[in-house]
């Protein structure tokens, strides 16, 4: 992913992507036979999560044009027992445990992270305004 820089040539931290919005995190996950690119809304306040979720819904067409299909889950329980809101796309089949599948997983992550980055460059200001 090093070959993909930001709009002004800046280095992008793909694994620890800085959204600039405390309540929003971009996350990648790889399990035995499933890999995901996620948008997590992590604010402890359910009402705040709802407002951010509704704003993402306003951008649903734009987001879905590049990251498809997307699952939209208002209450997603993470391993720690905390509830977050999650929007994600996933690929089933390629296994992180099979080296022969790594290329498919990499291409899935690359395509969707670039699409997410391009979406974020367009919409980030709206979400930053919501947080303030």
Which ranges hold each PLM region?
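UBC/E2-like fold recognition across ubiquitin and ubiquitin-like conjugation systems
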Residues: 1-5, 127, 132
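Polyanion-binding interface signature
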Residues: 1-92
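Ampiphathic alpha-helical segments that act as solvent-exposed interaction surfaces
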Residues: 93-131
């Amino acid at each position: 992913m090093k070959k993909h820089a930001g709009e002004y040539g800046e280095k992008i931290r793909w694994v620890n992507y800085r959204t600039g919005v405390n309540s929003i995190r971009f996350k990648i996950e790889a399990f035995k036979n499933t890999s995901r690119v996620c948008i997590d809304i992590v604010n402890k306040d359910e009402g705040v999560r709802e407002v951010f979720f509704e704003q993402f819904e306003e951008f649903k067409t734009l987001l879905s044009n590049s990251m498809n299909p997307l699952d939209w889950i208002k209450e997603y329980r993470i391993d720690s027992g905390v509830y977050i809101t999650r929007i994600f796309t996933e690929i089933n089949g390629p296994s992180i445990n099979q080296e022969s599948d790594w290329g498919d997983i990499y291409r899935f992550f690359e395509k969707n992270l670039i699409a997410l980055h391009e979406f974020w460059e367009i919409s980030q200001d709206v979400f930053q305004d919501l947080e303030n």
